[in-house]
Amino acid sequence: MSESQLKKVLKENETLKAQLEKSTTILKVSEACESLQDYCTKTSDPFIPGWSGENEWTKPLKGNGCSVL
């Protein structure tokens, strides 16, 4: 193997090592999906009727408050 070929191979090797090191910190898609599913199932949504009792957004207004349509 010539000197120039060796330099190219070593440079490519360093580039691949850097990419591998960088990819270890990236979150996998499956882990991100699982985290999103957990959040959605454990966090109540006030816009979904019946999720946790009466929907706060559909309750009649109390008192002399101002309502904007």
Swiss-Prot record:
The modification Cysteine methyl ester is found at residue 66. InterPro entries: G-protein_gamma-like_dom, GGL_sf. It is found in: Cell membrane. Residues 67-69 form a propeptide. This protein is thought to be subject to lipidation, and this requires phlp1. It comes from the Eukaryota. A lipid is attached at residue 66 (S-geranylgeranyl cysteine). It is a lipid-anchor. Keywords: Acetylation, Cell membrane, Chemotaxis, Lipoprotein, Membrane, Methylation, Prenylation, Sensory transduction, Transducer. One of its GO terms (molecular function) is enzyme activator activity. The modification N-acetylserine is found at residue 2. One of its GO terms (cellular component) is plasma membrane. One of its GO terms (biological process) is G protein-coupled receptor signaling pathway. Guanine nucleotide-binding proteins (G proteins) are involved as a modulator or transducer in various transmembrane signaling systems. This major G-protein of the squid photoreceptor is involved in visual transduction. The beta and gamma chains are required for the GTPase activity, for replacement of GDP by GTP, and for G protein-effector interaction. Required for normal chemotaxis in response to cAMP. G proteins are composed of 3 units, alpha, beta and gamma. Interacts with gpbA, and this requires phlp1. Belongs to the G protein gamma family. This is Guanine nucleotide-binding protein subunit gamma. It comes from Dictyostelium discoideum (Social amoeba).
